[in-house]
Regions:
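Transmembrane alpha-helical segments and their membrane-water interfaces
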Residues: 94-150
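Hydrophobic transmembrane alpha-helices and their immediate junctions
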Residues: 359-398, 434
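Helix-loop-helix junctions and helix-breaking kinks within/between transmembrane helices
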Residues: 39-50, 92, 96-104, 191-193, ...
Length: 456
């Protein structure tokens, strides 16, 4: 790019009201979307509704006053078509009014992702997600320590999620106080899988933050340690596979940068073949693998859930049952469909099956195409730019995709916001990116590491 036409990087006035207000709105929004159960357990469904409504109004106000036209123009045809397919499934649903409302709620959730893409650059975004993750993980560890060491027992939510005085199952507790007994911890999120999900994202943004922003060495070490600790204590096998995919992707992207096209593509072919062989081996040997990892051979009931979901899909493969995102209690065919150990489950535990089940085959095809295009664009951004900053979007994206073969988090809350953010922001013109360096990321990271070691 011509140096004359390259835009000058804006240095934000971090003490200005505008900067602080939008940053705090982002903090509160990301926290609420990542920790929705935490908010609900603390202030109830009514409080959660008020919280969400206030944040949505604030987001609309921030968006409207900042001239978002160019960002809105970057919304791709695939995302617009996906919303259209979801509305079509709602129109053909037996509970069409509820389904239309669910599409609206999904669009409202996506609006926050649109605003994040518009209001912040990639560097500011990594700080936002890092700071929120630090708070969530530190609070989770303190919460678990309080339950296990001081209270020495389980903690119920302030607003319980069951009727009567008898707790139906352990899953209804906010935390089970397992910090010292070897079982899974739940943290302030109230769910071990959610804690692992946030920990995976945290691990990525902490590493990138350490590489590019120059955060205090001790803060970075403590942050990375908390992410690793929460990952290990939450014991999510699905997230374990996702983290492995993230690590392999990071190595491949660093190795491929700056290489000739034929060399890059050779790396990619080897990586894809290895990933395919690994995935097939895991599926064929899932019983032995999951038993060795201390899990049930059916992946904690997932194979049973998938069989039931596929049975429903074959009854309405084209139009779907109508979009809901999370399955709604009391609605057929979801009420009582999946009950494990007295706990009802309201997702297919696979984002692709859930999209097909609810939105129909058209929504699934559009969704898959949108993910593929976004993956390619994010990968190109990570490999072609010399700054480590642009690694975090593709690594988080890959982690989300792999995790959502055993979960459906991508279709709601923080998952949908991140997907919307990546789908839109990756389409920003090159002029809005940071300047290219003279050496590949792997060289700069090695030099930075050596320099830090010498300074110790």
């Amino acid at each position: 790019m011509d140096p004359i036409t390259r835009p000058i990087r804006v240095i934000y006035d971090t003490k200005s009201w505008e900067y602080r207000s939008k940053t705090w709105l982002a903090y509160l929004g990301v926290f609420g979307l990542a920790c929705g159960d935490t908010v609900r357990y603390t202030i109830g469904w009514t409080g959660l509704g008020i919280w969400s409504g206030v944040l949505f109004i604030a987001t609309l106000w921030m968006l409207a006053r900042s001239n978002p036209i160019e960002t809105i123009k970057r919304i791709p045809w695939s995302m617009i078509a996906l919303y259209g397919a979801l509305l079509l499934s709602a129109a053909l649903s037996n509970y069409w009014l509820i389904s239309v409302g669910a599409v609206v709620i999904t669009a409202i959730t996506g609006t926050f992702g649109l605003w994040l893409a518009h209001a912040f650059d990639w560097r500011h975004l990594v700080r936002i997600f890092a700071n929120v993750s630090r708070f969530v993980l530190a609070s989770s560890l303190l919460f678990e320590f309080y339950a296990a060491a001081i209270l020495r027992g389980r903690i119920l939510p302030f607003f319980k999620n069951f009727e009567g005085e008898i707790v139906p199952a352990k899953a209804y507790y906010w935390t089970q106080g397992n910090l010292f007994n070897g079982d899974r911890i739940q943290g302030i999120l109230g769910n071990a899988n959610l804690l692992a999900y946030v920990s995976m994202i945290a691990l990525i943004v902490f590493a990138v933050e350490f590489a590019i922003i120059g955060t205090s060495r001790w803060i970075s070490i403590a942050s990375l340690a908390s992410a690793v600790l929460c990952l290990s204590l939450s014991k999510s096998v699905g997230i374990g596979f996702a983290v492995a995919a993230v690590l392999v992707s990071a190595v491949v992207s660093l190795a491929a940068e700056g290489q000739p096209k034929d060399v890059r593509h050779r790396y990619y072919r080897v990586a894809w073949v290895a990933a395919g062989i690994f995935a097939v081996a895991v599926w064929l040997m899932r019983g032995e693998i999951f038993t060795a990892l201390g899990k049930s051979p059916d992946m904690t009931g997932r194979t049973m859930i998938w069989k039931k979901v596929l049975g429903l899909i074959w009854d309405r493969p084209f139009q779907g049952y109508g979009w809901l995102s999370y399955w709604m209690p009391g609605i057929e065919p979801y009420e009582g469909l999946v009950v494990i150990n007295k706990v009802s489950y309201y997702q297919a535990h696979n984002a692709f099956l859930d999209m097909w089940l609810q939105g129909g085959i058209l929504a699934l095809i559009i969704f898959t195409v949108m993910l593929f295009i976004t993956f390619v664009k994010l990968w190109q951004l990570a490999v072609r730019h010399t700054s480590s900053l642009y690694l975090w979007p593709i690594l988080v994206f890959i982690g989300l995709i792999v995790q959502n073969f055993t979960e459906s988090r991508l279709l709601s809350e923080l998952g949908w916001v991140l997907l919307t953010l990546f789908v839109i922001k990756v389409r920003e013109p090159e002029e809005m990116l940071e300047p290219l360096g003279r050496s590949p990321k792997r060289v700069r990271l090695l030099y930075r590491g050596l320099r830090r070691n010498r300074s110790q």
